[in-house]
Amino acid sequence: MKTISRQAYADMFGPTTGDRLRLADTELFLEIEKDFTTYGEEVKFGGGKVIRDGMGQSQVVSAECVDVLITNAIILDYWGIVKADIGIKDGRIVGIGKAGNPDVQPNVDIVIGPGTEVVAGEGKIVTAGGIDTHIHFICPQQAQEGLVSGVTTFIGGGTGPVAGTNATTVTPGIWNMYRMLEAVDELPINVGLFGKGCVSQPEAIREQITAGAIGLKIHEDWGATPMAIHNCLNVADEMDVQVAIHSDTLNEGGFYEETVKAIAGRVIHVFHTEGAGGGHAPDVIKSVGEPNILPASTNPTMPYTINTVDEHLDMLMVCHHLDPSIPEDVAFAESRIRRETIAAEDILHDMGAISVMSSDSQAMGRVGEVILRTWQCAHKMKLQRGTLAGDSADNDNNRIKRYIAKYTINPALAHGIAHTVGSIEKGKLADIVLWDPAFFGVKPALIIKGGMVAYAPMGDINAAIPTPQPVHYRPMYACLGKAKYQTSMIFMSKAGIEAGVPEKLGLKSLIGRVEGCRHITKASMIHNNYVPHIELDPQTYIVKADGVPLVCEPATELPMAQRYFLF
């Protein structure tokens, strides 16, 4: 058998089993665990290459071949780090394996035909589109910013740049829900909208779920009282939707213990569990130790750096409609900013005790930095805590799988949409992001939405080739015309779908049904289901997990930062 060197093979078809790649400029290294190809039968498009008539391309009609093929991709997902071809049909992933022409090639399970378009995945890392579960719908331009960062699903609430939305992720009531569903129908991104769960009687909640909400949000600015929590969870259990909560920072309606009692062992998604974004001061972080609570972070505190504390006070005053001239407002803000709990948050992520990452977009968080800050935290923790259990000196595969799950599969599981999005798996919507390894987590090479390119870095439009400067991210065809309706999805409750909301409003986007929200626990959070016993000293704010103090230094320098954003 003829052989070539690993370097020559990698240059031609991308790395293969046993090869390692550095993620951006971090100290994180992945190692390819398996290659689905048959060596010598790889497919590649181009002049003099394999995917040509009678060679790698068969004669079948469109019904018998994939619509889109990503060749020789390095798939990075919660379930593995592998090299494979990815087949897409009707906007969904239908194959992960070996592509080619079965008439002349062996071991083909993804058929290439005249109806197949090719995306070159050689040397590229491929991930599922990110899911951000903490979106304040303050402005529609967030969709572009999220997409070009690699996020393809927004879950949250709001109605625009008004006081209620600047502070809370809530789309309240039937009229607001209908108008926002009509508006987000035009966005080239998947969307789910939260109704308001801050009410002590059930009917006002039921009507919002029936109006098309994906779930419910309880927020202290609207009242996160024990009765509201109890009532909201009762309706959520009845109608199979998730509840997210920003609990009572001021402890006015009750302390942390009263909130836990009102939750009563039922599943709930706790936002910014560390507390700087809001929640029982100073001990909301103890919710990380509850088996029924799905804990999440928002990105302004992630990772802990020398600048983290300083920027938070002003952000908080703006977002929560506070007045710096009122001492009580200043005290409220200061009660939420604790460097000790912010430091502990990084470590809890690395232990797999905090399950989800999100943004808190324009409301103390940055919509385009969910993915970037997740990997900055992973890098910081490797430097400060060393190799993760199960990893080796050669690769960080376990740590990498843990961190990618935080913004892909786990938020999908938390909100009942994992049957449709959240991973690179057969049957799921083809929301796929391609990365050059040197730019991983920072600037995608291609954002595919529902099987079609939505955004891409594109050079001078009047140039003879696509690459000359200036290169900017620009909207592509999946964002235009009727195509955007066939490549993006609005998620809503079963009750909303059965009530005919999509038909009543004339929604054109794909409609995704929420299911299975109420029977999950923290144990369902993949690679991030550790339930430690959490203690917090109310005087020093030092956090302990299973008796061990969680202390780390702030970072003075981070990867994936200035050197990537000079231009």
Swiss-Prot record:
Keyword Protein transport attached: no
Reaction(s) catalysed (UniProt annotation): urea + 2 H2O + H(+) = hydrogencarbonate + 2 NH4(+)
Domain Urease: from-to ranges: 129-567
Cofactor binding description: Binds 2 nickel ions per subunit.
InterPro entries xref list: Amidohydro-rel, Metal-dep_hydrolase_composite, Metal_Hydrolase, Urease_alpha_N_dom, Urease_alpha_subunit, Urease_AS, Urease_asu, Urease_asu_c
Effect of residue 527 to L: Reduces activity 6-fold
Induction: By urea.
Gene3D superfamilies for this protein: Metal-dependent hydrolases (3.20.20.140), Urease, subunit C, domain 1 (2.30.40.10)
GO annotations of cellular component type: cytoplasm
Outcome of swapping residue 472 to L: Reduces activity 12-fold
Effect of residue 312 to L: Reduces activity 30-fold
CDD domains for this protein: Urease_alpha (cd00375)
Pathway connected to this protein: Nitrogen metabolism; urea degradation; CO(2) and NH(3) from urea (urease route): step 1/1
Gene Ontology biological process terms from the UniProt entry: urea catabolic process
Residues holding substrate: 219
Matching NCBIfam families: PRK13206.1, PRK13207.1, urease_alph
Family membership noted in the UniProt record: Belongs to the metallo-dependent hydrolases superfamily. Urease alpha subunit family.
Subunit description: Probable heterotrimer of UreA (gamma), UreB (beta) and UreC (alpha) subunits. Three heterotrimers associate to form the active enzyme. The trimeric urease interacts with an accessory complex composed of UreD, UreF and UreG, which is required for the assembly of the nickel containing metallocenter of UreC. The UreE protein may also play a direct role in nickel transfer to the urease apoprotein.
Descriptive protein name: Urease subunit alpha
The organism of origin for this protein: Proteus mirabilis (strain HI4320)
Gene name per UniProt: ureC
